[in-house]
């Protein structure tokens, strides 16, 4: 064939292929329409895809029509039910590591907040670490002087448990230098205290929105738990203190529903002192182990009923668990009175196990060094010295700090009981070390059915930082 004939042949073949392709597409469309109509779905294929990004679940409804995707973002569905939380505590034979954030180690070269008072609380879907920032980052000039407890720069924030308190994953909760938080099964409730010492205000947030307030009633540093509050059947309970740290103060129990205060009662505790309670649900009541910052080296015990009636006293055990404290052998124990004549103190916790008690304490008697949890037979109800188990969490060569309690809800564990858990803060920097800042990291442990070996899960950051050498 001559060149013109070749061109005509190729063009004819191409035209034929094009016509065939068009016919096939038309047939495909007709068949698709007929099939979809027969199945009662019309022209659209609808599907829902759930993707998780960090701690936020994003729901996308994707509508597909031929080769076109339409993506519609819809609001995350909220939980429909309040958590029950009336189950008993599970029996714990030991405590296994749940998480460790290593915030100070990471913060030497990462964008990590300067914090104190970290604690953990759980919803039916997740556990989160809450903390009070100083409005500054580690290894930065604004970290200077962050040993101070109360300032206008302090904010209450949270991350998913195990994450460092970093800039990129932290969620703002409240402006606060004292706080508590808990989940009722539907939404998070947070209480953040801020303002001047004589006129501080606690702002109650529910689902991220401020819905109620508590003004200082004694005019002397209104403050709260620095650990998880407790929700039972949709009602949430927490304890607040207003008044001196070294003599008689005023104490109140608060009850809220959907973030709105529906009840409160004063705690009559003449001669005793209550601060920074560590509370948990147990058999339909709220049990709290608190701090006596006035005289006692034994810890106050507060048990709250749903109607806001309460019993208050001291942990009966014949072993002291506050710091500073005297020798175990010289301590007799009391269920009703403070003993030990040691001022100051540190936030701590305990768990009732029948008549027994698991109680945490620093290993050092005089400073916040080391941490152990001990089980005392009949220690909840008697002046018992019968220590039947001990597990070291931080050895006596490393700094500890505050500690507190929380529970894993049955929605998370699928058990018939509430798993007892605790966290230990590990404070670094001022006043014990040569730095310009004070911050902390934490280790979190949860109760299990087996004995767990002692070890030291200490902070491990190498100090001083670069900013401390300038």
Curated annotation (Swiss-Prot):
<feature type="glycosylation site" description="N-linked (GlcNAc...) asparagine; by host">
    <location>
        <position position="84"/>
    </location>
</feature>
<feature type="glycosylation site" description="N-linked (GlcNAc...) asparagine; by host">
    <location>
        <position position="39"/>
    </location>
</feature>
<feature type="disulfide bond">
    <location>
        <begin position="231"/>
        <end position="236"/>
    </location>
</feature>
<keyword id="KW-0325">Glycoprotein</keyword>
<keyword id="KW-1043">Host membrane</keyword>
<feature type="glycosylation site" description="N-linked (GlcNAc...) asparagine; by host">
    <location>
        <position position="144"/>
    </location>
</feature>
<keyword id="KW-0472">Membrane</keyword>
<dbReference type="GO" id="GO:0020002">
    <property type="term" value="C:host cell plasma membrane"/>
</dbReference>
<feature type="binding site">
    <location>
        <position position="322"/>
    </location>
    <ligand>
        <name>Ca(2+)</name>
    </ligand>
</feature>
<keyword id="KW-0479">Metal-binding</keyword>
<keyword id="KW-0106">Calcium</keyword>
<feature type="binding site">
    <location>
        <position position="150"/>
    </location>
    <ligand>
        <name>substrate</name>
    </ligand>
</feature>
<keyword id="KW-0326">Glycosidase</keyword>
<keyword id="KW-1015">Disulfide bond</keyword>
<feature type="region of interest" description="Head of neuraminidase">
    <location>
        <begin position="89"/>
        <end position="470"/>
    </location>
</feature>
<feature type="disulfide bond">
    <location>
        <begin position="316"/>
        <end position="335"/>
    </location>
</feature>
<keyword id="KW-0735">Signal-anchor</keyword>
<feature type="glycosylation site" description="N-linked (GlcNAc...) asparagine; by host">
    <location>
        <position position="293"/>
    </location>
</feature>
<dbReference type="GO" id="GO:0016020">
    <property type="term" value="C:membrane"/>
</dbReference>
<feature type="binding site">
    <location>
        <position position="296"/>
    </location>
    <ligand>
        <name>Ca(2+)</name>
    </ligand>
</feature>
<feature type="binding site">
    <location>
        <position position="291"/>
    </location>
    <ligand>
        <name>substrate</name>
    </ligand>
</feature>
<feature type="disulfide bond">
    <location>
        <begin position="90"/>
        <end position="417"/>
    </location>
</feature>
<feature type="binding site">
    <location>
        <position position="116"/>
    </location>
    <ligand>
        <name>substrate</name>
    </ligand>
</feature>
<comment type="similarity">
    <text>Belongs to the glycosyl hydrolase 34 family.</text>
</comment>
<feature type="region of interest" description="Involved in apical transport and lipid raft association">
    <location>
        <begin position="11"/>
        <end position="32"/>
    </location>
</feature>
<keyword id="KW-0812">Transmembrane</keyword>
<feature type="binding site">
    <location>
        <position position="292"/>
    </location>
    <ligand>
        <name>Ca(2+)</name>
    </ligand>
</feature>
<feature type="active site" description="Proton donor/acceptor">
    <location>
        <position position="149"/>
    </location>
</feature>
<feature type="disulfide bond">
    <location>
        <begin position="277"/>
        <end position="290"/>
    </location>
</feature>
<dbReference type="Pfam" id="PF00064">
    <property type="entry name" value="Neur"/>
</dbReference>
<keyword id="KW-1032">Host cell membrane</keyword>
<comment type="function">
    <text>Catalyzes the removal of terminal sialic acid residues from viral and cellular glycoconjugates. Cleaves off the terminal sialic acids on the glycosylated HA during virus budding to facilitate virus release. Additionally helps virus spread through the circulation by further removing sialic acids from the cell surface. These cleavages prevent self-aggregation and ensure the efficient spread of the progeny virus from cell to cell. Otherwise, infection would be limited to one round of replication.</text>
</comment>
<feature type="glycosylation site" description="N-linked (GlcNAc...) asparagine; by host">
    <location>
        <position position="398"/>
    </location>
</feature>
<feature type="transmembrane region" description="Helical">
    <location>
        <begin position="15"/>
        <end position="35"/>
    </location>
</feature>
<dbReference type="GO" id="GO:0046872">
    <property type="term" value="F:metal ion binding"/>
</dbReference>
<feature type="region of interest" description="Hypervariable stalk region">
    <location>
        <begin position="32"/>
        <end position="86"/>
    </location>
</feature>
<dbReference type="GO" id="GO:0005975">
    <property type="term" value="P:carbohydrate metabolic process"/>
</dbReference>
<keyword id="KW-1133">Transmembrane helix</keyword>
<dbReference type="GO" id="GO:0046761">
    <property type="term" value="P:viral budding from plasma membrane"/>
</dbReference>
<feature type="glycosylation site" description="N-linked (GlcNAc...) asparagine; by host">
    <location>
        <position position="54"/>
    </location>
</feature>
<dbReference type="GO" id="GO:0055036">
    <property type="term" value="C:virion membrane"/>
</dbReference>
<dbReference type="InterPro" id="IPR001860">
    <property type="entry name" value="Glyco_hydro_34"/>
</dbReference>
């Amino acid at each position: 064939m001559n060149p013109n004939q070749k061109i005509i042949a190729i063009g004819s073949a191409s035209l034929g292929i094009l016509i065939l392709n068009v016919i096939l597409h038309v047939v495909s469309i007709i068949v698709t329409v007929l099939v979809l109509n027969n199945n009662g779905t019309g022209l659209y294929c609808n599907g829902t895809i759930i993707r998780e990004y960090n701690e936020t679940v994003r729901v996308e409804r994707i509508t597909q029509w031929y080769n076109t995707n339409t993506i519609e973002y819809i609001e995350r569905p909220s939980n429909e039910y309040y958590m029950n939380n009336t189950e008993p505590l599970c029996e714990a034979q030991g405590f296994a590591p749940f998480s460790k954030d290593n915030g100070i180690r990471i913060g030497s070269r990462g964008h990590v907040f300067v914090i104190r008072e970290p604690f953990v609380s759980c919803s039916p879907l997740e556990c989160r670490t809450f903390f009070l920032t100083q409005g500054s980052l580690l290894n930065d000039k604004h970290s200077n002087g962050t040993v101070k407890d109360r300032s206008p720069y302090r904010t209450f924030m949270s991350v998913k448990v195990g994450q460092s308190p970093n800039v990129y994953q932290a969620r703002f909760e409240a402006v606060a230098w004292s706080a508590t938080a808990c989940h009722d099964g539907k939404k998070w409730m947070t209480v953040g205290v801020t303002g001047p010492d004589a006129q501080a205000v606690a702002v109650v947030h529910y689902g991220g929105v401020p819905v109620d307030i508590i003004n200082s009633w004694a005019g002397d540093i209104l403050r709260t738990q620095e650990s998880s509050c407790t929700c039972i059947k949709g009602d949430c309970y927490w304890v607040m203190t207003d008044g001196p740290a070294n003599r008689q103060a005023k104490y109140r129990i608060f009850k809220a529903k959907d973030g709105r205060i529906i009840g409160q009662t004063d705690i009559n505790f003449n001669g005793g002192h209550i601060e920074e309670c560590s509370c948990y649900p147990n058999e339909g009541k709220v049990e709290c182990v608190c701090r006596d910052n006035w005289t006692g080296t034994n810890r106050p015990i507060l048990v709250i009923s749903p109607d806001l009636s309460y019993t208050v006293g001291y942990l009966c055990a014949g072993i002291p668990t506050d710091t500073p404290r005297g020798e175990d052998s010289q301590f007799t124990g009391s269920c009703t009175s403070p003993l030990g004549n040691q001022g100051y103190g540190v936030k701590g916790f305990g768990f009732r196990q029948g008549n027994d008690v698991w109680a945490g304490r620093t290993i050092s008697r005089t400073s916040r060094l080391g941490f152990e949890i001990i089980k005392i037979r009949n220690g909840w109800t008697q002046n018992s010295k019968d220590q039947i188990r001990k597990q070291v969490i931080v050895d006596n060569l490393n700094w500890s700090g505050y500690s507190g309690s929380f529970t894993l809800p049955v929605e998370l564990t699928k058990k018939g009981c509430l798993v007892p858990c605790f966290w230990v803060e590990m404070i670094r920097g001022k006043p014990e070390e040569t730095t310009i800042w004070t911050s902390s990291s934490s280790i979190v442990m949860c109760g299990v059915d087996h004995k767990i070996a002692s070890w030291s899960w200490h902070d491990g950051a190498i100090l001083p930082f670069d900013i401390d050498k300038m």
